Protein backbone atom coordinates (compact mmCIF):
# COMPACT_ATOMS: atom_id res chain seq x y z
CA UNK A 1 0.00 0.00 0.00
CA UNK A 2 1.37 3.41 -0.99
CA UNK A 3 1.79 6.00 1.77
CA UNK A 4 -0.16 9.26 1.70
CA UNK A 5 1.92 12.29 0.77
CA UNK A 6 1.33 15.93 1.72
CA UNK A 7 0.28 18.48 -0.90
CA UNK A 8 3.02 20.74 0.45
CA UNK A 9 5.67 18.17 -0.55
CA UNK A 10 4.02 17.68 -3.94
CA UNK A 11 4.18 21.45 -4.58
CA UNK A 12 7.79 21.61 -3.37
CA UNK A 13 8.78 18.77 -5.70
CA UNK A 14 6.96 20.43 -8.58
CA UNK A 15 8.86 23.69 -8.00
CA UNK A 16 12.16 21.81 -7.88
CA UNK A 17 11.58 19.73 -11.01
CA UNK A 18 8.97 21.49 -13.15
CA UNK A 19 7.14 18.16 -13.50
CA UNK A 20 3.32 17.89 -13.40
CA UNK A 21 1.44 17.68 -10.06
CA UNK A 22 0.20 14.13 -10.65
CA UNK A 23 3.67 12.92 -11.68
CA UNK A 24 5.12 14.50 -8.53
CA UNK A 25 2.47 12.86 -6.33
CA UNK A 26 3.12 9.41 -7.86
CA UNK A 27 6.90 9.83 -7.55
CA UNK A 28 6.60 10.80 -3.87
CA UNK A 29 4.34 7.82 -3.18
CA UNK A 30 6.82 5.52 -4.92
CA UNK A 31 9.70 7.08 -2.95
CA UNK A 32 7.93 6.69 0.38
CA UNK A 33 7.79 10.46 0.85
CA UNK A 34 11.53 11.00 0.31
CA UNK A 35 11.84 14.17 -1.83
CA UNK A 36 15.40 13.47 -3.02
CA UNK A 37 14.45 9.93 -4.03
CA UNK A 38 11.32 11.27 -5.77
CA UNK A 39 13.50 13.75 -7.67
CA UNK A 40 15.61 10.85 -8.90
CA UNK A 41 12.51 8.92 -9.97
CA UNK A 42 11.22 11.93 -11.94
CA UNK A 43 14.64 12.54 -13.41
CA UNK A 44 14.88 8.96 -14.65
CA UNK A 45 11.39 9.15 -16.15
CA UNK A 46 12.08 12.60 -17.55
CA UNK A 47 15.36 11.56 -19.08
CA UNK A 48 13.71 8.54 -20.66
CA UNK A 49 11.23 10.94 -22.30
CA UNK A 50 14.11 13.17 -23.33
CA UNK A 51 15.80 10.27 -25.11
CA UNK A 52 12.64 9.72 -27.18
CA UNK A 53 12.50 13.37 -28.18
CA UNK A 54 16.14 13.49 -29.26
CA UNK A 55 15.30 12.57 -32.85
CA UNK A 56 13.19 15.65 -33.54
CA UNK A 57 14.48 18.45 -35.75
CA UNK A 58 15.80 21.61 -34.09
CA UNK A 59 15.43 24.71 -36.26
CA UNK A 60 14.74 27.51 -33.80
CA UNK A 61 16.83 28.62 -30.86
CA UNK A 62 19.17 31.24 -29.54
CA UNK A 63 22.66 32.61 -29.97
CA UNK A 64 23.90 33.47 -26.47
CA UNK A 65 27.08 35.40 -25.57
CA UNK A 66 28.80 36.25 -22.31
CA UNK A 67 31.91 38.44 -21.95
CA UNK A 68 33.68 38.74 -18.59
CA UNK A 69 33.64 42.12 -16.82
CA UNK A 70 37.32 42.73 -17.59
CA UNK A 71 36.65 41.85 -21.27
CA UNK A 72 39.48 39.28 -21.24
CA UNK A 73 37.38 36.18 -21.92
CA UNK A 74 34.14 35.50 -23.74
CA UNK A 75 31.98 32.59 -24.85
CA UNK A 76 29.21 32.18 -27.41
CA UNK A 77 26.90 29.27 -28.20
CA UNK A 78 24.16 28.29 -30.62
CA UNK A 79 21.47 26.40 -28.72
CA UNK A 80 18.64 25.00 -30.84
CA UNK A 81 15.07 23.93 -30.12
CA UNK A 82 12.03 23.05 -32.22
CA UNK A 83 9.81 26.13 -31.92
CA UNK A 84 10.13 29.90 -31.61
CA UNK A 85 7.81 29.71 -28.57
CA UNK A 86 10.39 27.69 -26.62
CA UNK A 87 13.27 29.85 -27.93
CA UNK A 88 11.62 32.80 -26.14
CA UNK A 89 10.91 30.75 -23.00
CA UNK A 90 12.69 31.91 -19.81
CA UNK A 91 13.75 28.33 -18.93
CA UNK A 92 15.42 27.95 -22.34
CA UNK A 93 17.25 31.27 -21.89
CA UNK A 94 18.45 30.19 -18.45
CA UNK A 95 19.77 26.97 -19.97
CA UNK A 96 21.61 28.92 -22.69
CA UNK A 97 23.10 31.23 -20.06
CA UNK A 98 24.23 28.35 -17.86
CA UNK A 99 25.91 26.45 -20.71
CA UNK A 100 27.63 29.63 -21.94
CA UNK A 101 28.78 30.43 -18.39
CA UNK A 102 30.14 26.88 -18.06
CA UNK A 103 32.18 27.27 -21.28
CA UNK A 104 33.46 30.62 -20.00
CA UNK A 105 34.53 29.30 -16.59
CA UNK A 106 35.92 25.87 -17.56
CA UNK A 107 39.65 26.24 -18.27
CA UNK A 108 39.80 23.31 -20.69
CA UNK A 109 37.69 25.37 -23.13
CA UNK A 110 40.25 28.20 -23.32
CA UNK A 111 40.51 29.61 -26.88
CA UNK A 112 38.58 26.66 -28.32
CA UNK A 113 35.64 26.51 -30.68
CA UNK A 114 33.81 23.63 -32.31
CA UNK A 115 30.70 21.48 -32.35
CA UNK A 116 28.54 21.37 -29.25
CA UNK A 117 28.92 17.59 -29.05
CA UNK A 118 32.59 18.12 -28.09
CA UNK A 119 31.68 19.49 -24.66
CA UNK A 120 28.62 17.37 -23.77
CA UNK A 121 30.68 15.02 -21.59
CA UNK A 122 32.24 17.87 -19.56
CA UNK A 123 31.27 18.08 -15.90
CA UNK A 124 29.60 21.40 -15.09
CA UNK A 125 31.97 23.90 -13.50
CA UNK A 126 29.39 24.74 -10.81
CA UNK A 127 27.97 21.23 -10.29
CA UNK A 128 30.64 18.50 -10.39
CA UNK A 129 29.19 15.08 -11.16
CA UNK A 130 26.63 16.46 -13.61
CA UNK A 131 27.53 16.78 -17.30
CA UNK A 132 26.44 19.36 -19.88
CA UNK A 133 24.57 16.54 -21.63
CA UNK A 134 22.59 15.67 -18.48
CA UNK A 135 21.72 19.35 -17.98
CA UNK A 136 20.34 19.51 -21.55
CA UNK A 137 18.40 16.26 -21.17
CA UNK A 138 16.82 17.50 -17.95
CA UNK A 139 15.76 20.66 -19.79
CA UNK A 140 14.29 18.55 -22.63
CA UNK A 141 12.22 16.63 -20.07
CA UNK A 142 11.05 19.84 -18.40
CA UNK A 143 10.39 21.94 -21.52
CA UNK A 144 9.08 19.11 -23.70
CA UNK A 145 11.05 19.82 -26.88
CA UNK A 146 14.27 18.50 -28.32
CA UNK A 147 17.21 20.80 -27.54
CA UNK A 148 20.63 20.65 -29.18
CA UNK A 149 23.87 22.47 -28.49
CA UNK A 150 25.09 23.01 -32.06
CA UNK A 151 28.36 24.89 -31.60
CA UNK A 152 30.42 27.01 -29.26
CA UNK A 153 33.27 29.52 -29.32
CA UNK A 154 35.52 30.69 -26.47
CA UNK A 155 37.99 33.56 -26.78
CA UNK A 156 40.71 34.46 -24.28
CA UNK A 157 42.75 37.58 -24.94
CA UNK A 158 45.41 39.85 -23.49
CA UNK A 159 43.57 42.75 -25.14
CA UNK A 160 39.78 43.27 -25.16
CA UNK A 161 36.62 41.47 -26.24
CA UNK A 162 33.31 42.91 -27.38
CA UNK A 163 30.03 41.14 -28.11
CA UNK A 164 26.95 41.98 -30.13
CA UNK A 165 23.66 40.11 -30.45
CA UNK A 166 21.14 40.96 -33.18
CA UNK A 167 17.49 40.07 -33.71
CA UNK A 168 16.79 38.81 -30.20
CA UNK A 169 19.47 36.15 -30.44
CA UNK A 170 19.36 35.18 -34.12
CA UNK A 171 22.90 36.46 -34.83
CA UNK A 172 25.81 36.82 -32.41
CA UNK A 173 29.32 38.25 -32.76
CA UNK A 174 32.34 37.88 -30.49
CA UNK A 175 35.14 40.30 -31.37
CA UNK A 176 38.78 40.36 -30.19
CA UNK A 177 40.44 43.77 -30.58
CA UNK A 178 43.48 45.77 -29.51
CA UNK A 179 43.27 49.39 -28.28
CA UNK A 180 45.56 51.63 -26.21
CA UNK A 181 42.65 52.23 -23.80
CA UNK A 182 38.95 51.57 -23.41
CA UNK A 183 36.73 54.62 -23.72
CA UNK A 184 33.31 55.48 -25.15
CA UNK A 185 34.74 56.30 -28.59
CA UNK A 186 36.53 52.95 -28.83
CA UNK A 187 33.41 51.08 -27.68
CA UNK A 188 31.26 52.90 -30.25
CA UNK A 189 33.74 52.00 -32.99
CA UNK A 190 33.95 48.29 -32.07
CA UNK A 191 30.15 48.18 -31.76
CA UNK A 192 29.94 49.47 -35.35
CA UNK A 193 32.46 46.85 -36.46
CA UNK A 194 30.52 44.09 -34.67
CA UNK A 195 27.30 45.26 -36.39
CA UNK A 196 29.18 45.20 -39.70
CA UNK A 197 30.18 41.57 -39.08
CA UNK A 198 26.60 40.64 -38.15
CA UNK A 199 25.11 42.29 -41.25
CA UNK A 200 27.75 41.58 -43.92
CA UNK A 201 28.96 38.06 -43.00
CA UNK A 202 32.73 38.47 -43.60
CA UNK A 203 34.84 35.34 -43.22
CA UNK A 204 38.27 36.89 -42.63
CA UNK A 205 39.63 40.00 -40.90
CA UNK A 206 42.29 40.85 -43.51
CA UNK A 207 43.40 39.59 -46.93
CA UNK A 208 46.45 37.86 -45.41
CA UNK A 209 44.10 35.66 -43.34
CA UNK A 210 42.68 33.95 -46.44
CA UNK A 211 44.22 30.46 -46.77
CA UNK A 212 46.44 30.14 -49.85
CA UNK A 213 44.42 27.22 -51.23
CA UNK A 214 41.20 29.31 -51.08
CA UNK A 215 42.87 32.15 -53.00
CA UNK A 216 44.34 29.79 -55.58
CA UNK A 217 40.98 28.10 -56.12
CA UNK A 218 39.28 31.48 -56.56
CA UNK A 219 41.96 32.65 -59.03
CA UNK A 220 41.61 29.40 -60.99
CA UNK A 221 37.80 29.72 -61.20
CA UNK A 222 37.96 33.39 -62.24
CA UNK A 223 40.63 32.64 -64.85
CA UNK A 224 38.57 29.80 -66.35
CA UNK A 225 35.49 32.05 -66.45
CA UNK A 226 37.41 34.80 -68.27
CA UNK A 227 38.85 32.36 -70.82
CA UNK A 228 35.43 30.80 -71.46
CA UNK A 229 34.05 34.30 -72.09
CA UNK A 230 36.66 34.57 -74.85
CA UNK A 231 38.80 37.23 -73.17
CA UNK A 232 42.30 37.58 -74.70
CA UNK A 233 44.98 35.64 -72.76
CA UNK A 234 47.13 38.75 -72.20
CA UNK A 235 44.42 40.60 -70.22
CA UNK A 236 43.02 37.61 -68.31
CA UNK A 237 45.31 38.14 -65.30
CA UNK A 238 44.21 41.78 -65.05
CA UNK A 239 40.54 40.71 -65.16
CA UNK A 240 41.20 38.07 -62.46
CA UNK A 241 42.81 40.64 -60.13
CA UNK A 242 39.87 43.02 -60.68
CA UNK A 243 37.37 40.29 -59.79
CA UNK A 244 39.46 39.22 -56.80
CA UNK A 245 39.00 42.73 -55.43
CA UNK A 246 35.22 42.10 -55.42
CA UNK A 247 35.85 38.77 -53.67
CA UNK A 248 37.85 40.60 -50.97
CA UNK A 249 35.11 43.21 -50.54
CA UNK A 250 32.63 40.43 -49.91
CA UNK A 251 34.68 38.10 -47.68
CA UNK A 252 37.23 40.32 -45.90
CA UNK A 253 36.02 42.55 -43.06
CA UNK A 254 38.56 45.38 -43.47
CA UNK A 255 37.97 45.53 -47.25
CA UNK A 256 34.16 45.69 -47.01
CA UNK A 257 32.21 48.89 -47.70
CA UNK A 258 31.23 50.26 -44.27
CA UNK A 259 27.48 49.78 -43.69
CA UNK A 260 27.02 53.27 -42.22
CA UNK A 261 28.98 55.01 -44.99
CA UNK A 262 29.39 52.80 -48.05
CA UNK A 263 31.85 55.08 -49.86
CA UNK A 264 34.40 54.13 -47.20
CA UNK A 265 35.88 50.75 -46.40
CA UNK A 266 35.93 49.42 -42.84
CA UNK A 267 39.74 49.81 -42.71
CA UNK A 268 39.39 53.53 -43.62
CA UNK A 269 36.83 54.13 -40.87
CA UNK A 270 39.09 52.48 -38.27
CA UNK A 271 42.15 54.42 -39.47
CA UNK A 272 40.37 57.78 -39.67
CA UNK A 273 39.04 57.37 -36.12
CA UNK A 274 42.62 57.89 -34.88
CA UNK A 275 41.91 55.50 -32.00
CA UNK A 276 44.63 52.96 -32.92
CA UNK A 277 42.14 50.10 -32.79
CA UNK A 278 43.21 46.81 -34.35
CA UNK A 279 40.71 44.04 -35.09
CA UNK A 280 42.42 40.73 -34.27
CA UNK A 281 39.73 38.09 -34.88
CA UNK A 282 36.00 37.51 -34.70
CA UNK A 283 33.47 34.72 -34.39
CA UNK A 284 30.02 35.08 -35.97
CA UNK A 285 27.11 32.70 -35.35
CA UNK A 286 23.78 32.84 -37.14
CA UNK A 287 20.88 30.65 -36.10
CA UNK A 288 20.77 27.54 -38.28
CA UNK A 289 23.90 28.69 -40.11
CA UNK A 290 25.85 25.46 -39.66
From Swiss-Prot:
It comes from the Bacteria. One of its GO terms (cellular component) is cytoplasm. Pfam families: EF_TS. It is found in: Cytoplasm. Keywords: Cytoplasm, Elongation factor, Protein biosynthesis. GO terms for biological process: translational elongation. InterPro entries: EF-Ts_dimer_sf, Transl_elong_EFTs/EF1B, Transl_elong_EFTs/EF1B_dimer, Transl_elong_Ts_CS, UBA-like_sf. Belongs to the EF-Ts family. This is Elongation factor Ts. It comes from Aquifex aeolicus (strain VF5). The gene is tsf.
Amino acid sequence: MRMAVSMEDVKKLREMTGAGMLDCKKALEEAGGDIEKAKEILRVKGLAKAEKKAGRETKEGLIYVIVSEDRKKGAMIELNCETDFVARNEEFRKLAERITRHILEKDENKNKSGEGSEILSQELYDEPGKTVETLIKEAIAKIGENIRLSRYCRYDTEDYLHSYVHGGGRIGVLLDFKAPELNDQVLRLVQDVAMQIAAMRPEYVRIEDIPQEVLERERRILREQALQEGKPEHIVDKIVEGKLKKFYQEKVLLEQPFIKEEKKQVKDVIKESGLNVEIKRFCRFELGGL
